[in-house]
């Protein structure tokens, strides 16, 4: 996705704040702190198998986010999913 801002294999933000769905490309290993803070319309996100870390407040306030698969993630930051009131299912792997 062209609107993703990626530096050193870490998503640090996105230039579009009103997106509904998002696919993070393979090779990304981390989602930075506050990367998707208050993306209220984001309801679906596909994470790559290479993702290992989700930063502090990465998805905080993503009120429409319903499901997330974090099977390969080994570190989740503080308040990473705070305020995600529609989040009903999280798939964890053995790394957490």
Regions found by a protein language model. Give the residues of each.
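Consensus positions within tandem repeat domains that build extended binding/scaffold surfaces
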Residues: 12, 33-35, 55-58, 77-82
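Structural signature of tandem-repeat unit edges
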Residues: 1-6, 16-30, 39-53, 63-75, ...
């Amino acid at each position: 996705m062209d609107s993703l801002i990626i530096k050193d294999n870490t998503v640090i933000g996105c230039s579009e704040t009103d997106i509904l769905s998002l696919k993070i490309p393979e090779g990304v290993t981390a989602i930075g702190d506050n990367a998707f803070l208050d993306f209220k319309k984001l309801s679906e996100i596909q994470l790559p198998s290479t993702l290992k870390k989700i930063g502090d407040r990465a998805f905080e306030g993503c009120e429409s986010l319903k499901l997330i698969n974090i099977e390969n993630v080994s570190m989740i930051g503080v308040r990473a999913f705070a305020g995600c009131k529609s989040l009903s299912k999280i798939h964890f792997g053995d790394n957490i």
